[in-house]
Swiss-Prot record:
Family: Belongs to the SctE/SipB/YopB family.
Name of protein: Type 3 secretion system translocon protein SctE
Localization of this protein: Secreted; Host membrane
Function: Component of the type III secretion system (T3SS), also called injectisome, which is used to inject bacterial effector proteins into eukaryotic host cells. YopB/SctE and YopD/SctB are inserted into the host membrane where they form a pore and allow the translocation of effector proteins into the cytosol of target cells. Is an essential virulence determinant. Required for YopE translocation.
UniProt key word Secreted: yes
Length: 401
């Protein structure tokens, strides 16, 4: 650089003009200072001072194509068959394609991904709960239908049981009345006495059954007492029938039993109509028997009184026996239907209890899932706040110390 020579400056001592040589000022010495280095008085670098951590190598790194393929395969294997697979695949490109130069961006994207995954898991759990709730409601509707059927069957069983009771009492009373007539007329004192005994046992059997239904006799006692009374009643009835009508009574009883066995289905189908007419039949039995005896007496005047009484008693016992068999068959069928409906109802209740336990378990898992989601979000917010505080502290530090 050349010097400039001027003549317009004077010295303060003599006032004469002397040439003045002006030289440019030297440029200041500039040195580069690295963060964390301090200079001493001599201009050297001191080893003490504020030292900032070096940036991580992953900040400036990029995901290679091979690493991206491995990440994609891993996520596909994990998320295969789940409802959130589409959502995760949408975020794979976000996490693997952008340059990880900004930790803040990575944290924000990671937080969004975790939040969306938790929402998907919640939706899946809620869908499972709704599905189980619908199944539970279907079970409840089925149970209500079963309960209605059970109530209807119980009513029908009650009606058929009432009809069976009516015929049971009618048989017992008819046996006593016919036996008394036979004893009083002298036609068959022994057979009449047997019929009276059979009727008395029948009435005792009906009274014991009624007491058991009222709770006066325990079920354990009825399991022993009921079959015994029934067997005695049947035995006395058979003996009195044989003694009254002779050997032909056995064939008659066999024919009646065969007819009842062959016509059980049709009789059961017509049981409802017959049950409705039970009262009419029971009230008209005595009139029918009386008119039958009168007609038989008028038509066969030459017959003896013994034949008339036997014919009337046979007609009465056959009519009452057939009615009793029909009502007993209907009653047994209704009892079986009632037990079947009760079994179905108990099974449906067990299924409902199992579904309710599954719903409760899903609710617990959903609550745990919500709690874990809240904890993860709190952790992410803490990380973001800590990162912000660190950046704020770094921005507030002086460049030199």
């Amino acid at each position: 650089m050349s010097a400039l020579i001027t003549h317009d400056r004077s010295t303060p001592v003599t006032g004469s003009l002397v040439p003045y040589i002006e030289t440019p000022a030297p440029a200041p010495l500039q040195t580069q200072q690295v963060a964390g280095e301090l200079k001493d008085k001599n201009g050297g670098v001191s080893s003490q001072g504020v030292q900032l951590p070096a940036p991580l190598a992953v900040v400036a790194s990029q995901v290679t194509e091979g690493q991206q393929q491995e990440i994609t395969k891993l996520l596909e294997s994990v998320t295969r068959g789940t409802a959130g697979s589409q959502l995760i695949s949408n975020y794979v490109s976000v996490l693997t394609n952008f340059t990880l130069a900004s930790p803040d961006t990575f944290e924000i994207e990671l937080g969004k991904l975790v939040s969306n995954l938790e929402e998907v898991r919640k939706d899946i759990k809620i869908a499972d709960i709704q599905r189980l709730h619908e199944q539970n409601m279907k079970k409840i509707e089925e149970n209500q239908e079963k309960i209605k059927e059970t109530e209807e069957n119980a009513k029908q069983v009650k009606k058929s049981g009432m009809a069976s009771k009516i015929f049971g009492w009618l048989i017992a009373i008819a046996s006593v009345v016919i036996g008394a007539i036979m004893v009083a007329s002298g036609v068959g004192a022994v057979a009449g006495a047997m019929m009276i005994a059979s009727g008395v046992i029948g009435m005792a059997n009906m009274a014991v059954k009624q007491a058991a239904e009222d709770g006066l006799i325990s079920q354990e006692a009825m399991q022993v007492l009921g079959p015994i009374l029934t067997a005695i009643e049947v035995a006395l009835t058979v003996v009195s029938t044989v003694m009254t009508f002779g050997g032909s009574a056995l064939k008659c009883l066999a024919d009646i039993g065969a007819k009842l066995g062959a016509n059980t289905a049709s009789l059961a189908a017509k049981g409802a109509e017959f049950s409705a007419k039970v009262a009419q039949i029971s009230t008209g039995i005595s009139n029918t028997v009386g008119s039958a005896v009168t007609k038989l007496g008028g038509s066969f005047g030459s017959l003896t009184m013994s034949h008339v009484i036997r014919t009337g008693s046979q007609a009465t016992q056959v009519a009452v026996g057939v009615g009793s068999g029909i009502t007993q068959t209907i009653n047994n069928k209704k009892q079986a239907d009632l037990q079947h409906n009760n079994a179905d109802l108990a099974l449906n209740k067990a299924d409902m209890a199992a579904l309710q336990s599954i719903i409760d378990r899903l609710k617990e898992e959903l609550s745990h899932l919500s709690e874990s989601h809240r904890q993860v979000m709190e952790l992410i917010f803490q990380m973001i706040n800590a990162k912000g505080d660190m950046l704020h502290n770094l921005a507030g530090r002086p460049h030199t110390v």
